[in-house]
Amino acid sequence: MLQCAPKKNERLRGSCDFCTQSKLRCNKNKPSCRRCTIQQQPCVYSVARRTGRPPKHPRKANDCQEANGQHGEQDPVTSTPGGSCQQQSNHLLDVEGDGANFTLADASTTAQGRETAASSALDNALLVGETFGFSSLLDDPLIQSDDFLSFSLCMPPGEEEGHMASPRALNGSTGPCSPTVLSSIDVPHLPARFGFLESSVESGLHGRTGPHLVEQPDKIVPSSFSEMEKIYDEGLTFSGLDSAINAVTNNGKGEPSASGTMAAHPHSKRQCFCSTSMSKLQMLISHPTLCQKNSRARFDMTLFLEEVVFNIHRDVLQCLVCQSKSLHSLASLCICTDWVIEALRDVAQDLSSGQDNLGGFRAGLCPPKDKFSICVGRFVLDDQLRESCTRSLVKYRLRKLVPIMDTMMKLNYRGAGGALSQAIRTMVEDVRHKIESALGMMEL
């Protein structure tokens, strides 16, 4: 980048989205900052996303648009489409669960905050590799290659597609991918008999990126991997719950159906579906197929239900209608959370007893006979490292449920008291005890 003269640009006043340094004007009339110039790195300053007050007069707005036109030949890294000088304002509150605590963050955060969050997420993804037992592989000279960070679930040639992996893992299996795929191991996926929910494998693996929803008057059906990924990324668990209930009830036969109204606007100001989603979750958990005696739920189905519990709890916290939390809703959510804890504790018990190196599970991340293997670069993890990965995954899921129970206890104190409030308090304490017991079992 060319050296910039220390002349302050009055029109492009603001700060860099990356390093929050003041702006300078260089001899090419491109906005940049001092730190990016010194370190010879592309400056991520964007006029459209700059912070500050909007122009008070239309003439100033026109001047701003002219300035954007003058800088139309900027570097692609620093330029953004459009030339708007508008501010993005969104007063909704997002609830972020980082596995240790819940924090309320204003959704109108600047691009600087998003860049910082993305950077920290990348660092966390690299640190996750150590907890999953990958640190022992880092010293191997053969692993120092460009595709080392290609973390995916690989299937030997000639095998049938009997078990569907997560969309991110499948997309990563076709070639090198970003380091953030290291954290995709905790993305839940449905069991093999729910494979019809993710039918369009080829369309998801051959360059199809745009969403394509099959819209009908009464339902919205996902038709590709990208749409399934979008549904779960946006927290639209209603469609997934309806599909899972239909699959469990009909043994995977028939087409899944979901109410388009509930799947489209889970946080609508006029309608609230938090209690509806919890009722659907409780209906699925209490179904005889998942509650048979002397049988345990599939590992991937447990991960799917745990993710649904986490998303529903987040929806309840950020819902604009649920100003006063219902004790009946808390009781339903606590019952569902208790079921997930029991299922994860069964997995922890099998891991502690060393039962057949995960072969005792009916299915999951590592089915028998190495039909799917966890790969890091050119290496396939052996049984010991696969067990370490699953153990770390179960620990992460258990610890992620701890702040949910803490928040339940705080919301319960807001109630009027009585027998139901006391019952919820007892259930929360019992679930916390089960979490601590399972974590202690895995530490032994």
UniProtKB/Swiss-Prot annotation:
Residues 50-59 have a biased composition (Basic residues). Disruption phenotype: Abolishes the production of AF-toxins and their precuror 9,10-epoxy-8-hydroxy-9-methyl-decatrienoic acid; and impairs the pathogenicity. The keyword Cell inner membrane does not apply. Its main location: nucleus. It is found in: Nucleus. GO terms for molecular function: DNA binding; DNA-binding transcription factor activity, RNA polymerase II-specific; zinc ion binding. Pfam families: Zn_clus. One of its GO terms (cellular component) is nucleus. Disulfide bonds: none annotated. Keywords: DNA-binding, Metal-binding, Nucleus, Transcription, Transcription regulation. SMART domains: GAL4. PROSITE patterns: ZN2_CY6_FUNGAL_1, ZN2_CY6_FUNGAL_2. Residues 16-43 bind DNA. It comes from the Eukaryota. Residues 76-87 have a biased composition (Polar residues). InterPro entries: OAF3, Zn2-C6_fun-type_DNA-bd_sf, Zn2Cys6_DnaBD. The keyword DNA-binding applies. Residues 49-87 are annotated as: Disordered. Transcription factor that regulates the expression of the gene clusters that mediate the biosynthesis of the host-selective toxins (HSTs) AK-toxins responsible for Japanese pear black spot disease by the Japanese pear pathotype. AK-toxins are esters of 9,10-epoxy 8-hydroxy 9-methyldecatrienoic acid (EDA). On cellular level, AK-toxins affect plasma membrane of susceptible cells and cause a sudden increase in loss of K(+) after a few minutes of toxin treatment. Gene clusters encoding host-selective toxins (HSTs) are localized on conditionally dispensable chromosomes (CDCs), also called supernumerary chromosomes, where they are present in multiple copies. The CDCs are not essential for saprophytic growth but controls host-selective pathogenicity. This is Transcription activator AKTR-1. It comes from Alternaria alternata (Alternaria rot fungus).
